[in-house]
């Protein structure tokens, strides 16, 4: 079975379409498009071990998050940076 030019073009276009739609990120380097994420939880991690406890709590949710303790109201907030 011979591969025709038409089949080759169809395969190439399908390959380009699939590869362009696979990698979608909320952050594009160099352009400055960024969607920050912040979610606050109970103050328990902050009460147990301070900022380090909050940091460890957020890292269990996702390795990309950082934790910070807030005082008004008392909460452990996980944010992206």
From Swiss-Prot:
Signal peptide segment: 1-24
Keywords tagged on the record: Antimicrobial, Disulfide bond, Fungicide, Plant defense, Secreted, Signal
Subcellular location per the Swiss-Prot or TrEMBL entry: Secreted
Presence of keyword Metal-binding: no
Location, primary (coarse class): secreted
Record bears the keyword Secreted: yes
Disulfide bonds, paired cysteine numbers: 40-78, 46-69, 54-76, 58-77
GO cellular component, as recorded: extracellular region
One of the protein's GO biological processes: defense response to fungus
Similarity remark: Belongs to the DEFL family.
Identification of the protein by name: Defensin-like protein 115
Organism the protein comes from: Arabidopsis thaliana
């Amino acid at each position: 079975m011979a591969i025709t030019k038409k089949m080759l073009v169809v395969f190439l276009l399908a390959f380009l379409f699939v590869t362009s739609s696979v990698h979608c990120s909320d952050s594009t380097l160099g352009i400055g498009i960024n969607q920050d994420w912040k979610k606050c939880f109970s103050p328990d991690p902050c009460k147990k071990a301070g900022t380090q406890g909050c940091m460890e709590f957020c890292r269990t949710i996702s390795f990309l998050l950082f934790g910070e303790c807030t005082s008004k109201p008392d909460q452990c907030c996980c944010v992206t940076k």
